[in-house]
């Protein structure tokens, strides 16, 4: 019995399973890179199709990487206060490199670099890490969590009939819900205008009765 054993085996050894999770998460992040630089660009950025079990297993890793990247963005903004606009290799850049301002820049940027290294240890792809920190993380700055969604596909996989699913990043391919417009009705006449008419009718009725 597999009591107290977390996760799915997926029919693989631990090393093979770890490599699978790293490749799936990197593949999801790389779908957001510049399509003009990719010969095999995805049809829909921010989306991969895999089996339902693999999607559920890799989802926590993707969420963790996005959280690390998102929390490191304030350190990058703080470091911009101390950076220089001089060209690398110029005399002005060399002077800045030896100044106290560079030390402040390096100290402010240290949490950002540390987060990049941690994510690189998790997924092992430098290009995917660059896409995550440069493109994807800014999209979720105001979102407290839940950066991905899993949608089950109706058509199973050919060969073994495995259940397929879409794992995608939220916020870009969301459906736009349209609410129906409220019907406009003619406004009823004000009570002050209808009151004199009602009094006139009652006077006519009493006069005719007499």
From Swiss-Prot:
One GO cellular component term: cytosolic large ribosomal subunit
Family indicated by similarity: Belongs to the bacterial ribosomal protein bL17 family.
SUPFAM superfamilies in alphabetical order: Prokaryotic ribosomal protein L17
Region annotated Disordered, chain positions: 177-210
Name of the protein: Large ribosomal subunit protein bL17
GO molecular function: structural constituent of ribosome
Annotated GO biological process: translation
Entry keyword set: Ribonucleoprotein, Ribosomal protein
InterPro entries: Ribosomal_bL17, Ribosomal_bL17_sf
Record text on subunit structure and interactions: Part of the 50S ribosomal subunit. Contacts protein L32.
């Amino acid at each position: 019995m597999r009591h107290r054993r977390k996760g799915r085996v997926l029919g693989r050894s631990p090393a093979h399973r770890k490599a699978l999770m790293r490749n799936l998460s990197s593949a999801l992040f790389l779908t957001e890179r510049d399509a003009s630089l990719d010969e095999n660009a995805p049809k829909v950025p921010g989306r991969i199709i895999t089996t339902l079990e693999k999607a559920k297993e890799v989802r926590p890793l993707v969420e963790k990487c996005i959280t690390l990247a998102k929390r490191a963005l304030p350190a990058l903004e703080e470091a911009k206060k101390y950076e220089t606009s001089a060209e690398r290799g110029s005399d002005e850049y060399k002077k800045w490199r030896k100044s106290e301002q560079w030390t402040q820049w390096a100290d402010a940027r240290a949490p950002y670099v540390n987060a990049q290294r941690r994510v690189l240890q998790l997924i092992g792809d430098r290009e995917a890490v660059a896409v995550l920190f440069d493109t994807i993380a800014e999209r979720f700055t105001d979102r407290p969590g839940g950066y991905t969604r899993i949608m089950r596909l109706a058509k199973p996989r050919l060969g073994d009939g495995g259940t397929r699913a879409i794992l995608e990043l939220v916020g870009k391919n969301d459906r736009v819900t349209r609410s129906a417009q409220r019907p406009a009705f003619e406004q009823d006449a004000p009570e002050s205008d209808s009151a004199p008419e009602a009094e006139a009718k009652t006077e006519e009725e009493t006069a005719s009765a007499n």
